[in-house]
């Protein structure tokens, strides 16, 4: 079976929030191909949105800087739910620090869908 498999509540209480440090070096080859992929999508008329899904962790501000910078340079939207208090304040939404459980996935899907609707169909269109 492939695709999403729901995970019920956390198997055990989650520890405190984990701290992730940003990488000191970005892989320039990977970044080049992400940029090429974005450019190809834009040439075809696609709406490109970068998304960082929720994790039960704390990150420093530089963690997503390369992605945020690329989004800014290309005029794209970057939806960063990783450090979003809606999720980091709710350990009951997580199966483990990197995976939402079914309750968290449902809540994230509601929020993400609403945000995506605003991007794809701005008011007045």
Where do the model's predicted regions map?
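Serine/threonine-rich low-complexity intrinsically disordered regions
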Residues: 7-9, 14, 60, 90, ...
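A short, structure-level motif marking secondary-structure boundaries and short turns
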Residues: 21-23, 51-53, 97
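Acidic-and-aromatic substrate-binding clefts and catalytic sites of carbohydrate-active enzymes
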Residues: 24-30, 54-63
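A short acidic, amphipathic alpha-helical/loop segment
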Residues: 36, 63-66
């Amino acid at each position: 079976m492939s695709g999403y498999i729901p995970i019920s509540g956390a198997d055990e209480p989650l520890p405190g929030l984990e701290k992730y440090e940003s990488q000191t070096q970005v892989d320039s080859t990977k970044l080049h191909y992400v940029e090429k992929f974005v450019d190809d999508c834009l040439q075809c008329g696609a709406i490109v949105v970068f998304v960082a899904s929720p994790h039960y962790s704390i990150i420093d501000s530089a963690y997503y800087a390369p992605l945020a910078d690329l989004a800014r340079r290309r005029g794209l939207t970057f939806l960063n739910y990783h450090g979003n208090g809606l999720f980091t304040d709710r350990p009951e939404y997580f199966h483990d620090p990197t995976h939402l459980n079914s309750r968290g996935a449902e809540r994230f899907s509601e929020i993400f869908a609403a945000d995506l609707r605003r991007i794809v169909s701005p008011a007045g269109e």
